[in-house]
């Protein structure tokens, strides 16, 4: 598989700090058993980056669970 970088994801979430939060939040979900939205046999953090780069996950993940 091709290597995934932060630069591949920055188009979908332009703020690097929000991108970091979104990746860690999604990686935690994947590690706890959530189904991946892209086909990947990588670690949860890489899968989360791939999902964001593909546009399957975006900034909206940061707003989940807030009242």
Curated annotation (Swiss-Prot):
What top-level branch of life does the organism fall under?
A: Bacteria
Which Pfam families does the annotation name?
Answer: RNA_pol_Rpb6
Q: Its Gene Ontology molecular function terms?
A: DNA binding; DNA-directed RNA polymerase activity
- According to the record, the segments passing through the membrane are none
The record ties this protein, via InterPro entries, to: DNA-dir_RNA_pol_omega, Pol_omega/Rpo6/RPB6, RPB6/omega-like_sf
Q: Which residues form a coiled coil?
A: none
Reactions this protein catalyses: RNA(n) + a ribonucleoside 5'-triphosphate = RNA(n+1) + diphosphate
Top enzyme category: transferase
Q: Which GO terms describe its cellular component?
A: DNA-directed RNA polymerase complex
* Keyword Ribonucleoprotein among record annotations: no
Q: Which UniProt keywords apply?
A: DNA-directed RNA polymerase, Nucleotidyltransferase, Transcription, Transferase
Q: Which Gene3D superfamilies match?
A: 3.90.940.10
GO BP, one example?
Answer: DNA-templated transcription
Q: What is its EC number?
A: 2.7.7.6
Functional description taken from the UniProt entry: Promotes RNA polymerase assembly. Latches the N- and C-terminal regions of the beta' subunit thereby facilitating its interaction with the beta and alpha subunits.
Quaternary form?
A: The RNAP catalytic core consists of 2 alpha, 1 beta, 1 beta' and 1 omega subunit. When a sigma factor is associated with the core the holoenzyme is formed, which can initiate transcription.
**Of which family is this protein a member?**
Belongs to the RNA polymerase subunit omega family.
Q: What is this protein called?
A: DNA-directed RNA polymerase subunit omega
What organism is listed for this UniProt entry? Thiobacillus denitrificans (strain ATCC 25259 / T1)
| Upper taxonomic lineage | Bacteria, Pseudomonadati, Pseudomonadota, Betaproteobacteria, Nitrosomonadales
Q: Which gene encodes it?
A: rpoZ
